[in-house]
């Protein structure tokens, strides 16, 4: 093996070999069961971020683990067409390169441009997935707009329409006035803003007065421009101030519209004056109030968010109301909503109807892609009536057919599903699945798989023009079919029978409603078991938290704190990193600040760590459901872990290759084999480690599974067992050396199989080198059997004896550290309180004590026999004493301790000064203050320890 571990030299070659040889494919033998995971399809034009790297590590660990357990595994890969994101990207590119809009090109030519863009950049994320070591079946790669999935989408739409679960209606949606499309709640970013609350006077009609004699009601609003569309003023039914006015009318200023005063529990009596203007066409809460009171909806905004020349009046059932007057003042027509706001407030002031303007903090909804304020808008859209499907989907989780890990996310799921609204599935875009609906010249709608099918079904002559709906489906609609459409539905259902329901879905909590819930509903509606029972899409939903930066902030381009997983794998120099973080920014004014923080945090850039170190770090940090603060130091630590494993393997191979390693090894001479206590102990410990690892994997505790591997490999195998082999390999009999060599190669080989799911590359490399020494067959570790716990291998005696030996060695090492005695200096130990078992252990393990503790002698003191001045350690009931005379230069040690005490005392005084400074405590973040306090506590402990040592030396001096 190479002297140093260099991941760059092994990873890509290995992956290419795995892929070419078809190791990622299902092997077809279902005797141990089938196992399937569907990758959440990333945006086709996107690139890998830390969230992807995290989830892909979890999924690949599960797939590799189950594959080695003998399961017929499929990790289904694919990408999402990401309607709005992709269309915007291509539109920006078109504008920059050709100075044209999509409308200049027309729909068909623009769509060709998008497909070209997809072909050019669509492979980026799949290349990056390969770099992460993802063992997906690339031959089955799908795309949400490929021919098969498009057919599935069409089929689902038509069937839902035929089942009366899809309809077209005029309802309130999140409208993006810049992109001219409805968007989902997930694409709306609510930002905290400091705005105003305008208090307006609404005159009472018909001479009515309030209880305190006023001829108006005072309403407070953050959006005075929408008052042109008010349909009512609401008060709480129990509010005594206004009870006499319920059912009376307001004369709405500026438009002179009579609107009713209605009673509704939605109103908070304690907030403001207890009177709320109701604008059902421009506010989601008001829309619900309007439905309850059957109020007409006055839509006063155009799709560009400007004031209309006259309001569109709509009934609560979505039909147009032609009897009510929707006229609006001419002076406002065409005015942008925010300019209209200023003009309307000015007019209220002129009319003497502006009570006051107060500062007010509020959440303003912005389009996460367009960056403009989103407008609740009444538009004609297609909807899925999801309530009937939601009932079955709720029951699937209630009865345990689907489990959430961690379980707390079930509550989030239930709260959403029990308050579910119809799903708006149409988008005013060009890139996406076009809605399979056609209109005749009278506006009558026909739904079918194709225009030909529509004409045949409804007997429409070719001479009659039909126009296909211009809208496309919400991206989440096709994603909702992901588990069954990718397996061949509706045409080919063989794979569906094999791999569905899938086993686990790995996803973030933020899309439980948008994706997870909709997959459950759609799958259970369309996929049934042979007995007709609705089939779930997956048995377990493993919910991950977000990966945040080291300070706990969400990673975002605008913050300049995004980390690219590939930069941690391959490394990146500082200048390239700065350019990457500050180039092509939406907000270029932030570039200088981002450059400064990047140069401070990564003054030498980021060094290459390799895929295995990154994967292991992500697994080790995967505590269920919690957000993770990224920690570069842990990544550095796990890179060192890879080095440790590499160097340990080199030690094993240097001592075993070309040697007799016992039965099954190529150089076995047929002699006897004797296992040392250390050999028996490591075999037992490895066996127990396998059991613990399996338990953690079964409960999706990847962090505990990773820590189990780390503890065994570094702390037990490397730090203890390899050291314990040295006395045997140097001075043992032939049978003992054969036994230790046999144990070394067999445990190392099995360790690679145990670690492989999390660290695929380094383990394959080491396994290929060590397997010939064990007689193990197989072309790749990927298909080798996963280690299994064997109750017959439990060796409690070896475990207890060796742990006792370790305690003795640790006690001696601690004494050396405390007294500053060189590790190479031989020591003589005295023992008191020695049991018969202790005595037997001492006699049997002299070689270990001589080599690892550098004990020249171990003398048992007789009863009542006194010992010279010694420093002691306890091992159970046995006392270990090291006579101190002649071991140390007492004066030099006392001087050293005094010097250390002085330094520590000064440091404590410095921190105390800091913490007593009121200015520092007031300004410093709590985390910084806690860190300083923890540092002071550590220093105090160090002072106590040194003071004790000084007292011991003082006794010697006396």
From Swiss-Prot:
- What is an example of a GO molecular function annotated in this UniProt entry? ATP binding
The record's Pfam families line, in alphabetical order, gives: Anticodon_1, tRNA-synt_1, Val_tRNA-synt_C
Matching InterPro entries:
aa-tRNA-synth_I_CS, aa-tRNA-synth_Ia, Anticodon_Ia_Val, M/V/L/I-tRNA-synth_anticd-bd, Rossmann-like_a/b/a_fold, tRNA-bd_arm, tRNAsynth_Ia_anticodon-bd, Val-tRNA_synth_C_sf
Q: Which reaction does it catalyse?
A: tRNA(Val) + L-valine + ATP = L-valyl-tRNA(Val) + AMP + diphosphate
User: Single Gene Ontology BP term?
Assistant: valyl-tRNA aminoacylation
> What class does this enzyme belong to in the EC scheme?
ligase
Which sequence ranges form a coiled-coil region, renumbered to this chain? 887-956
Which residue numbers does the motif 'KMSKS' region cover?
554-558
Task: List, alphabetically, the GO terms of the cellular component aspect.
Answer: cytosol
Similarity section = Belongs to the class-I aminoacyl-tRNA synthetase family. ValS type 1 subfamily.
The protein here is known as Valine--tRNA ligase
Gene behind the chain? valS
């Amino acid at each position: 093996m190479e002297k140093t571990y260099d991941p760059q030299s092994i990873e890509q070659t290995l992956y290419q070999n795995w892929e070419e040889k078809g190791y990622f494919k299902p092997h077809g033998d279902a005797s141990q069961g089938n196992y399937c995971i569907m990758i959440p399809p990333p945006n086709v034009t996107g690139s890998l971020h830390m969230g992807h790297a995290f989830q892909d590590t979890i999924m690949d660990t599960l797939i590799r683990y189950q594959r080695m357990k003998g399961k017929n595994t499929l990790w289904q890969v694919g990408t999402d067409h990401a309607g709005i994101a992709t269309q915007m990207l291509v539109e920006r590119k078109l504008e920059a390169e050709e100075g044209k809009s999509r409308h200049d090109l027309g729909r068909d030519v623009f769509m060709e441009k998008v497909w070209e863009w997809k072909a050019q950049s669509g492979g980026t994320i799949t290349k990056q997935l390969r770099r992460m070591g993802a063992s997906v079946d690339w031959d089955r790669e799908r795309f949400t707009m490929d021919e098969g999935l498009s057919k599935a989408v069409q089929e689902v739409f038509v069937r839902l329409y035929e089942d009366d679960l899809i309809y077209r209606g005029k309802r309130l949606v999140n409208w993006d006035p810049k992109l001219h499309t409805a968007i989902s709640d997930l694409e709306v970013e609510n930002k905290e803003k400091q705005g105003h609350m305008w208090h307006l006077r609404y005159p009472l009609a018909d001479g009515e007065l309030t209880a305190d004699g006023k001829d108006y009601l005072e309403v407070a609003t953050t959006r005075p421009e929408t008052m042109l569309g008010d349909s009512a003023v609401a008060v709480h039914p129990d509010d005594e101030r206004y009870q006499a006015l319920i059912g009376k009318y307001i004369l709405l200023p500026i438009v002179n519209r009579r609107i009713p005063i209605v009673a509704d529990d939605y109103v908070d009596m304690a907030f403001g004056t207890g009177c709320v203007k109701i604008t059902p066409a421009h506010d989601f809460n008001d829309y619900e109030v309007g439905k309850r009171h059957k109020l007409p909806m006055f839509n006063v905004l155009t799709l560009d968010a400007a004031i209309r020349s006259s309001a569109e009046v709509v009934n609560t059932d979505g039909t147009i109301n032609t009897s009510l007057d929707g006229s609006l003042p001419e002076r406002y027509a065409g005015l942008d909503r925010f300019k209209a706001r200023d003009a309307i407030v000015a007019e209220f002031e002129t009319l003497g109807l502006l009570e006051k303007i107060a500062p007010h903090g509020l959440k303003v909804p912005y389009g996460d892609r367009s960056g403009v304020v989103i407008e609740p808008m009444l538009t004609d859209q297609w909807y899925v009536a999801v309530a009937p499907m939601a009932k079955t989907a709720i029951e699937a989780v209630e009865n345990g057919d689907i489990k959430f890990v961690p379980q707390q996310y079930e509550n989030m799921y239930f709260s959403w599903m029990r308050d579910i609204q119809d799903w708006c599935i149409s988008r005013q875009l060009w890139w996406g699945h076009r809605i399979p609906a056609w209109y005749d010249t009278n506006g009558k709608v026909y739904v079918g798989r194709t225009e030909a099918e529509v004409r045949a079904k409804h007997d429409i002559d070719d001479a009659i023009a039909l126009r296909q709906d211009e809208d496309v489906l919400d991206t989440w609609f096709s994603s909702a079919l992901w588990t069954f459409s990718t397996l061949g539905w509706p045409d080919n259902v063989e794979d569906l029978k094999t791999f569905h329901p899938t086993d686990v879905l790995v996803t973030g909590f933020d899309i439980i409603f948008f994706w997870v819930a909709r997959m459950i509903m759609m799958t259970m509606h369309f996929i049934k078991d042979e007995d007709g029972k609705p089939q779930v899409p997956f048995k377990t939903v493993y919910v991950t938290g977000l990966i945040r930066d080291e300070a706990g902030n969400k990673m975002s381009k605008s913050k300049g704190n995004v980390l690219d997983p590939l930069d941690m794998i391959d490394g990146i120099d500082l200048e390239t990193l700065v350019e990457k973080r500050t180039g092509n920014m939406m907000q270029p004014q932030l570039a200088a600040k981002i450059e400064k923080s990047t140069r401070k945090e990564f003054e030498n850039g980021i060094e290459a760590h390799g895929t295995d170190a990154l994967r292991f770090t992500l697994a080790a940090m995967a505590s269920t459901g919690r957000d993770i603060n990224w920690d570069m130091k842990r990544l550095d630590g796990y890179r060192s872990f890879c080095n440790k494993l590499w160097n340990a393997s080199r030690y094993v191979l240097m001592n075993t290759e070309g040697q007799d390693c016992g039965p099954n090894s190529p150089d076995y001479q047929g002699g006897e084999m004797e296992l040392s206590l250390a050999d028996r102990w490591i075999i037992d410990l490895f066996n127990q480690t396998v059991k613990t690892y399996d338990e953690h994997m079964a409960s999706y505790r990847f962090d505990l599974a990773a820590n189990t591997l780390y503890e065994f490999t570094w702390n037990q195998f490397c730090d203890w067992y390899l050291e314990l082999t040295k006395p045997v390999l140097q001075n043992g009999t032939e049978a003992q050396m054969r036994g230790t060599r046999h144990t070394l190669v067999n445990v190392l080989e099995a360790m690679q199989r145990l670690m492989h799911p999390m660290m695929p590359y380094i383990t394959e490399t080491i396994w290929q080198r060590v397997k010939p020494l064990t007689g193990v067959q197989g072309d790749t570790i990927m298909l080798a059997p996963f280690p299994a716990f064997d109750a017959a291998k439990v060796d409690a005696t070896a475990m207890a004896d060796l742990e006792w030996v370790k305690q003795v060695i640790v006690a001696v090492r601690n004494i050396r550290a405390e007294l500053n005695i060189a590790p190479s200096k031989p020591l003589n130990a005295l023992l008191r309180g020695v049991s018969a078992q202790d005595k037997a252990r001492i006699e049997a393990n002299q070689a270990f004590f001589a080599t690892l503790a550098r004990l020249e002698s171990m003398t048992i003191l007789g009863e009542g026999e006194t010992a010279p001045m010694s420093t002691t350690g306890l091992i159970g009931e046995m006392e270990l004493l090291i006579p101190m005379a002649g071991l140390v230069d007492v004066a030099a040690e006392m001087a050293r301790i005094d010097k250390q005490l002085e330094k520590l005392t000064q440091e404590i005084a410095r921190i105390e000064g800091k913490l007593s400074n009121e200015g520092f405590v007031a300004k410093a973040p709590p985390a910084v203050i806690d860190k300083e306090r923890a540092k002071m506590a550590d220093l105090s402990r160090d002072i106590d320890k040194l003071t004790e040592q000084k007292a011991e030396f003082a006794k010697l001096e006396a």
